[in-house]
């Protein structure tokens, strides 16, 4: 059984039945049959479904936000923002459908016509996490449904309400039954799904361990995978012209979603000239933050996704401090109340070779590093096995862009956060995974770019091509 373990209260709520292995064949057969029909629909019909889905997300924003507030503790204002982004994604792919799926005509080269057409490849498996329950699904589902692929979606076990809502909205929007199938399944059941010949590709957002397992099985079965596995993103400040404003931006972005965002800036890197001012300012800023329930309008952050997640982070911080791997300047303790609450924390003097220095902390923990100059700041930023996103902050845009060009990430921003938008590609390198989602790149992963070359029988291009 899956149950909502409400992180706001620590209490178990609704329960949902998990599938058993005997149901796998039926699920995949239904998805395959649906694919044969869905791929044959006109682009206009698919776009209309996505457009209606966007409308439904907006119409149900309050209900949908409440689901994820109860499931994983997301503050209501953040939850509503997530639902709106999802609506934007579905609407983007609806409005740009013809542009994104347009045939590409190539120079004829002794043929009468040479064209590359974007075609679907079949049923896809999505394995999605709990931190953005609607957004992660939309990022994968919208472009692939537009292409004509069908989807089997295994969501995080703590998000049963929101995962079912994703299917319900698409079906109400006009998507044929079984073109999107939500399943309540365990991670251990996924290997058989990935290996099954009826699944033609798999997208996972989650842990490195899960990503490695999926990539291995997908590779052994000659099918494509897309992985988004988190990050330890740097936030470089190269001058102190607007220091307090920049630090406010950092704190806002780092603590967004209670610090549970893959592309949040985990490592703040500042020059030694203004390091002490940075630490002093953030120590007070973070110490003054209010922790509350998901529906508390005055809360700065909410609970962690689960009591277990909270306990793991607190234990890591305590161990780091005890071993001399970091100094906890403020926070980092459990809050004595029912639910998965902790004090937001600020760490300094972090040894980058230790757990808290080199591994992602998925919670409300800010880390400040000191660099003697810009060159060392770049070196610290690139001293990571991750490579999701980064940002550079400075008043000299040319200098900031020069720094940005030296960072080894999938996405780099100057004077703004690692933003998510339907029209921007999303993805990383190294231990952060591979592949791209959103914008035109979203229809470029699970697609057959099919070459058609047409020649008359009297065309000299018919001779062997060797």
Where are these regions (language model features)?
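Rossmann-like NAD(P) dinucleotide-binding subdomain of oxidoreductase/dehydrogenase enzymes
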Residues: 105-245, 371
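Conserved C-terminal structural/oligomerization subdomain of aldehyde/semialdehyde dehydrogenase
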Residues: 9-15, 199, 236, 284, ...
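Residues at or immediately preceding the N-termini of alpha-helices
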Residues: 7, 21-24, 43, 61, ...
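N-terminal Rossmann-like NAD(P)+-binding subdomain of aldehyde/semialdehyde dehydrogenases
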Residues: 1-112
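Residue-level signal for inorganic ion chemistry
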Residues: 10, 46, 68, 90, ...
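Short, well-ordered beta-strand elements within core beta-sheets of diverse protein domains
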Residues: 12-19, 34-40, 125-126, 235-238, ...
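ALDH superfamily catalytic-core signature
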Residues: 209-351, 414, 461-464
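Structural signal for hydrophobic packing residues in well-ordered secondary-structure cores
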Residues: 35, 39, 54-61, 65, ...
